Regions:
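Extended, non-globular alpha-helical segments
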Residues: 1-29
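C-terminal membrane-associated helical module and adjoining short loops/tails
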Residues: 2-6, 16-17, 35-44, 118-223
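Core segments of transmembrane alpha-helices
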Residues: 13-20, 71-80, 107-108, 130-142
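Membrane-embedded alpha-helical segments that form the functional core of polytopic membrane enzymes
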Residues: 18-66, 79-101, 186-199
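Helix-loop junctions at the membrane-solvent interface of multi-pass transporters
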Residues: 23-27, 85, 113, 143-144, ...
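A cytosolic-side transmembrane-helix exit/cap motif
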Residues: 52-60, 112-123
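Cytoplasmic-side transmembrane-helix entry/capping segments in multi-pass membrane proteins
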Residues: 67-70, 98-99, 124-130
Length: 223
């Protein structure tokens, strides 16, 4: 294996995956949210960059082809687990996350079972779109934590009556509470909608992979 830049970026993305969760054990919020968001977005961008550079410089390798989907899955799975811990077990979050995790385990199991025939389960364009939507959804949901915590910090010491008057426009909004609340709502519902879209694409691509694997699953084992 050659340590080309695309391979280095892939390894860095894999190494960054647990950092998204661990940072919440090291830093208080919202600083942890900021670092997790920056780390996740940077890692997601390397997913595009390493493939682009590998094609541009003709530096494709078996190592990169093997590690790239593993790094993607590690980033998504660890980030989703982190979000579940941050948001709690909300129905709107549990269902799409469960669908995404089930599909990832199912397809990985299919590939392992097929062995040298796993080449029939090549990554499709729709699967790439699925990964892109997943990563955008996760980034948006991490940003929700930032808006939520800045809002919470700014209302400390304010009575509910004052907060209500600010939202009613009766008192000057010096701390931008209305804007923070609006952006938090947009990030939350936007992230949830994108996550459900990703879950739908996840199911569709999972069924597609199963259909492609079925001819091999019907084969009788040879003695």
């Amino acid at each position: 294996m050659r340590w080309t830049l695309p391979n280095i970026l892939t390894v860095a993305r894999l190494a960054a995956a647990p950092g998204v969760a661990i940072i919440f054990l090291i830093l208080p919020r919202p600083y942890a949210d900021w670092v997790a968001l920056i780390l996740f977005v940077t890692a997601a961008l390397t997913d595009w960059l390493d493939g682009y550079l590998a094609r541009l410089w003709k530096q494709h390798s078996r190592f990169g082809a093997m590690l790239d989907p593993i790094a993607d899955k590690a980033m998504v799975v660890i980030a989703l687990a982190t979000l579940m811990g941050l948001f709690g077990f909300q129905t709107l979050l549990i269902l799409p996350v469960a669908a995404i995790l089930f599909r990832e385990v199912f397809v990985s199991g299919l590939r392992e079972f097929l062995g040298n025939k796993a080449g029939t389960l090549q990554v499709t364009k729709l699967a790439k779109w699925k990964t892109t939507v997943q990563m955008i959804a996760i980034a948006v949901l991490f940003s929700y934590g930032i808006f939520e915590h800045h809002f919470g910090m700014n209302v400390i010491g304010m009575s509910p009556e004052i907060v209500a008057q600010i939202f009613a426009g009766e008192v000057e909004d010096e701390f931008h509470l209305v804007a923070l609340s609006q952006w938090a709502n947009r990030a939350y519902f936007g992230g949830i909608i994108l996550l459900w879209l990703a879950a739908g694409l996840t199911v569709v691509t999972g069924v597609d992979y199963l259909a492609k694997a079925m001819p091999h699953l019907r084969e009788e084992p040879h003695d």
